[in-house]
């Protein structure tokens, strides 16, 4: 399986009302219309190409990162790009809101998946354009049985908040080691062992929470997850216990998680997931949920203060489970900045 990095470059964030994306697209239409005949795309006889729009819609609820799903929690909201859609992102919004009754707010493009053999049949090539959306969870509704699920249901090895999950030592590493030992030559064996060490933080290498897609693709290549065995039923059940998804939707979800884990380190998108007012502990727990790692409390608060990301509201939380804490809000002027240069969240293993 090729990495998602082989797809299109990520696009800039899209405005909630879609104006900027539509304006850019409208400006490009006359240029396409005037293109010489020899530059117009050709279609191959007997073969079709279609565009599919897929949403990775994320919320953080009760300290858990959750993703909006369909079809008994085995699919992401998606639908074909149709002629009636005035732009890609307007088509995405139409499908998500039709299928889930959940409005979209912050949206940015992830990648374009166009690999062959994506499980979509050989008579048509489907280009899937994926988007990452951040929201606050609302009760799911609709005709497609939409539901919110923890993304650790699909990637249980990614949650390191309480230490290294047992599934890594008990299931993943023994099977991955066997995969490496089965290599036909010494060079490939060593290459596989190196990949395992880098992706899972072995042999003195640190755990990198951003390598979500690389870990998933390694498990796929080793044939350890259900998606890798669909065309080979004779292999029996996959040895790694985790929830699979239709087609390559779990690969797309892995791409979205990796993007968000990287983005929270340099851009204040985490505030899209929080209520209007929050405590610093709520902010910290939200970051930890997304990263799958704990952060150092004092360093985290010092960083937030240094970056001037929040301001006090003058009110206290009404949570009766402990001592009242100060309520903060996100400084809205930060929204006009493209990035917080140099911001790195202090993530620790403890």
Regions found by a protein language model. Give the residues of each.
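Long, intrinsically disordered, low-complexity Ser/Thr/Pro-rich regulatory/activation regions
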Residues: 133, 308-350
């Amino acid at each position: 399986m090729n990495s998602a990095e082989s797809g299109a470059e990520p696009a800039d964030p899209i405005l909630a009302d879609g104006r900027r994306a539509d304006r850019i697209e409208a400006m490009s239409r006359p240029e396409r219309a005037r293109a010489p005949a020899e530059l117009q795309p050709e279609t191959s006889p007997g073969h079709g190409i279609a565009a599919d729009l897929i949403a990775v819609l994320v919320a953080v609820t009760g300290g858990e990162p959750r993703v909006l799903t369909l079809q008994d929690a085995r699919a992401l909201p998606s639908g074909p790009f149709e002629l009636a859609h005035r732009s890609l992102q307007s088509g995405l919004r139409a499908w998500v809101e039709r299928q889930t009754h959940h409005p979209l707010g912050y949206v940015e493009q992830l990648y374009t998946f166009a690999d062959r053999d994506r499980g979509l049949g050989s008579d048509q090539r489907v280009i899937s354009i994926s988007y990452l959306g951040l929201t606050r969870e609302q009760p799911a509704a609709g005709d497609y049985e939409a539901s919110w699920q923890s993304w650790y249901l699909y990637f249980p090895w990614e949650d390191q908040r309480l230490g290294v999950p047992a599934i890594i030592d008990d299931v993943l590493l023994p099977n991955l080691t066997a995969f490496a030992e089965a290599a036909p030559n010494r060079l490939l064996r060593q290459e596989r062992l190196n990949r395992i060490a880098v992706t899972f933080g072995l042999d003195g290498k640190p755990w990198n929470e951003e390598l979500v897609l690389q870990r998933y693709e390694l498990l796929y290549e080793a044939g350890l997850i259900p998606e890798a065995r669909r065309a080979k039923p004779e292999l029996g059940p996959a040895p790694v216990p985790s929830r699979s998804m239709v087609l390559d939707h779990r690969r797309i979800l892995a791409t979205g998680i990796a993007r968000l884990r990287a983005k929270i380190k340099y851009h204040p998108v985490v505030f899209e997931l929080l209520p209007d007012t929050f405590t610093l502990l709520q902010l910290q727990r939200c970051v930890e949920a997304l990263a799958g790692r704990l952060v150092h409390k004092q360093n985290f608060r010092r960083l937030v203060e240094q970056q001037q990301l929040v301001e006090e509201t003058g009110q206290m939380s009404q949570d009766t489970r402990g001592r009242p804490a100060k309520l903060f809000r996100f400084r809205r002027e930060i929204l006009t900045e493209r990035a917080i240069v140099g911001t790195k969240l202090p993530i620790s293993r403890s």
